[in-house]
Design a protein with these regions (language model features):
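ASCE P-loop NTPase helicase motor core
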Residues: 1-51
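Short loop/turn segments immediately following beta-strands, especially the blade-tip
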Residues: 15, 111-113
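Conserved beta-strand scaffold positions in the cores of enzyme catalytic domains, especially
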Residues: 26-30, 92, 167
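A residue-level signal for conserved active-site and pocket-lining positions in enzyme catalytic cores
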Residues: 31, 63-64, 96, 106, ...
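ATPase catalytic-site recognition across NTP-hydrolyzing enzymes
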Residues: 37-95
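Gly/Thr-rich phosphate-binding beta-strand-loop-beta motif of the actin/hexokinase/Hsp70
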Residues: 86-110
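Mg2+-dependent endonuclease catalytic cores in nucleic-acid-processing enzymes, primarily RNase H-like
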Residues: 107, 115-215, 236, 240-242
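Charge-patterned, long linear interaction tracts outside catalytic cores
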Residues: 219-243
C-alpha cells in the first residue's frame, strides 16, 4: 500500500479494493476469476479455493487483485498496535541518523522479558535536522535516560554527549543485522498506536530473497534504531550489537 499508484488513485480518493465505476475522471474496472466461473474447469477453481484456505493474504493479492497491507516477504509479522508500557517498565531509546533523504529517528522501548514483549513508541522521524535540533529533541523526550545510537556517527554522538544527552554508540560486527532481527522476531512487538512511520516500516521491511538472511536496505530507519537499543539490552553490551 506504499506504491504511488495506490496512494494517488485509491487512498487519496477513498477508493476501495475491487471497486468499479468512475471517480474524478478515472475509470476503475476490476475483474477476477469469480466473474468467469462458468468458463473455468473444476480443477482451476479448486486451485483458487485451496489458495484461499492456505494463504488468504496471497489469495487476496494474487488471485483477487487486492493491495497488500504488507510487502511480500516481510520480515516482521509478530507485531500489533497497543498501549505503550502499561506496566511502567524502564524506558530507554534507540536512535538512527540521516539528513537530507534519510530520516533521523528516535524510538522509545520498554522490554518485558518475562512476557517476551517489547513495547515500542515513535518519538522522531524527520529529515534535515542539525546537531542542536537533535540534542533539543533528545533532551525533551529522553532527559537523562539512555540512548543507544548508530556508531557510524561517532562525531555526532560525541557532540550530543558533550551537550548533555546520555548517549552511546552501538557495537557492530559480522552478522549483526541478522542477530538483531532474530531477537526482535523472538518477542511480541507492541507498537504504540500513533507510531505510524514505524508501522509503515514493519509492513515493508522485507527479505531480499526467499530463504535468505539478507534484507532489502529500505524501510529501516526506525527499525535500525529499534535494533540498537534492544540488542544492547538483550544481547549484552559485551556482545555484538546491531547496525
Amino acid at each position: 500500500r506504499e506504491h504511488w499508484v495506490y496512494k494517488r488513485f485509491f487512498e487519496s480518493k477513498g477508493v476501495r479494493d475491487g471497486s468499479n465505476g468512475s471517480i474524478d475522471g478515472v475509470n476503475y474496472i476490476h475483474t477476477t476469476y469469480l466473474d468467469n466461473v462458468a468458463n473455468l474447469s473444476k480443477g482451476v477453481i479448486a486451485t483458487m479455493e485451496r489458495m484461499r484456505v492456505d494463504d488468504i493474504d496471497n489469495y487476496n493479492n494474487v488471485i483477487l487483485g487486492g493491495w497488500r497491507a504488507r510487502a511480500e516477504g516481510v520480515v516482521f509479522t509478530n507485531w500489533r498496535f497497543g498501549d505503550f508500557n502499561p506496566d511502567g517498565l524502564q524506558v530507554t531509546y534507540g536512535q538512527d541518523y540521516g539528513f537530507k533523504n534519510d530520516a533521523n529517528t528516535l524510538v522509545g522501548v520498554a522490554i518485558d522479558k518475562s512476557k517476551k514483549i517489547i513495547y515500542i513508541q515513535e518519538h522522531l522521524y524527520q529529515t534535515g535536522l542539525n546537531t542542536h535540533d537533535l540534542y533539543t529533541i533528545n533532551n525533551k523526550v529522553c532527559g537523562r535516560d539512555l540512548i543507544v545510537a548508530d556508531s557510524a556517527e561517532p562525531r555526532l554522538i560525541s557532540e550530543l554527549s558533550s551537550k548533555g544527552n546520555n548517549i552511546r554508540g552501538c557495537k557492530k560486527g559480522p552478522g549483526s543485522i541478522s542477530a538483531g532481527v532474530s531477537i526482535l522476531q523472538s518477542y511480541e512487538l507492541v507498537l504504540e498506536n500513533n507510531s505510524k512511520n514505524i508501522a509503515t516500516e514493519l509492513n515493508n521491511y522485507a527479505y531480499a530473497d526467499k530463504g535468505s538472511n539478507l534484507f532489502v536496505d529500505d524501510y529501516n530507519h526506525s527499525l535500525d534504531a529499534l535494533r540498537y537499543i534492544t540488542s544492547f539490552h538483550l544481547m549484552g553490551s559485551s556482545k555484538i550489537e546491531v547496525r
